[in-house]
C-alpha cells in the first residue's frame, strides 16, 4: 500500500466519523425538541390564527440574513465546521399573533458516544454548556435544558414590561 493510499483511507475514515457525529447530533436535537414540546404541556401542536392559518407553538429553524426566523427541519440544517449543530427554537407564548414568539439559540455538540449512550453538551443562548448523558430512550435527560430554555423565554417576556410597571 502506498503512502497516498494511507492518506486516502485516513481521509475516508474521518469523513465517515463526521457523518456518524452528524447523525447522532441531529437525532439528539430531534429528541430534545420532542421532549421540550411534551414538557411544555402544549394544548396542541398548532394554534389557528385569525386568518385560519395553522401556527406551531414550537418551531425549529435558524436566524436568516435579514435577522428573521427561518423555519427548517433539523435533518436539513448544516453542521458547523467545529462539529456542532446550531439551531433556534421559536416558542409561541400564547394563541394570538399579538403575543410574542420567543426565539432561543441552542447549540449541541457530541462529547462522546459509545455502547452505553451518548454524551452531549447543550448550550442555550451561549451560556455554559449543560452536559447531558442519554441512554437509549431516556426521556428525562433533557429536563435541565428545557428548564434553561423556559428561563430564557421568561426573561425575554419580562423585558417587555412597560418601564412604569417594573
PLM region spans:
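Short, charged/polar micro-motifs that form catalytic or ligand-binding hotspots
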Residues: 15, 19-27, 75, 132-139, ...
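Glycine-rich, aromatic-bearing surface loops/beta-hairpins
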Residues: 109-166
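Acidic-enriched, low-complexity/disordered segments with a strong bias for Aspartate over Glutamate
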Residues: 5-6, 20, 49, 59, ...
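Generic secondary-structure transition motif, activating predominantly at the C-termini of alpha-helices
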Residues: 8-15, 40, 93, 153, ...
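Amphipathic, interaction-prone secondary-structure segments
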Residues: 50-110
Amino acid at each position: 500500500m502506498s503512502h497516498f493510499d494511507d492518506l486516502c483511507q485516513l481521509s475516508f475514515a474521518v469523513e465517515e466519523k463526521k457523518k456518524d457525529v452528524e447523525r447522532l447530533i441531529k437525532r439528539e436535537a430531534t429528541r430534545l425538541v420532542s421532549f421540550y414540546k411534551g414538557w411544555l404541556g402544549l394544548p396542541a401542536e398548532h394554534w389557528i390564527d385569525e386568518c385560519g392559518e395553522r401556527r406551531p407553538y414550537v418551531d425549529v429553524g435558524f436566524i436568516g440574513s435579514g435577522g428573521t426566523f427561518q423555519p427548517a427541519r433539523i435533518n436539513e440544517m448544516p453542521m458547523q465546521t467545529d462539529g456542532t449543530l446550531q439551531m433556534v427554537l421559536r416558542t409561541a407564548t400564547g394563541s394570538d399573533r399579538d403575543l410574542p414568539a420567543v426565539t432561543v439559540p441552542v447549540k449541541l455538540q457530541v462529547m462522546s458516544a459509545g455502547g452505553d449512550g451518548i454524551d452531549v453538551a447543550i448550550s442555550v443562548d451561549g451560556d455554559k454548556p449543560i452536559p447531558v448523558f442519554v441512554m437509549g430512550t431516556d426521556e428525562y435527560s433533557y429536563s435541565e435544558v428545557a428548564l434553561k430554555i423556559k428561563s430564557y423565554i421568561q426573561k425575554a417576556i419580562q423585558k417587555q414590561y412597560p418601564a412604569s410597571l417594573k
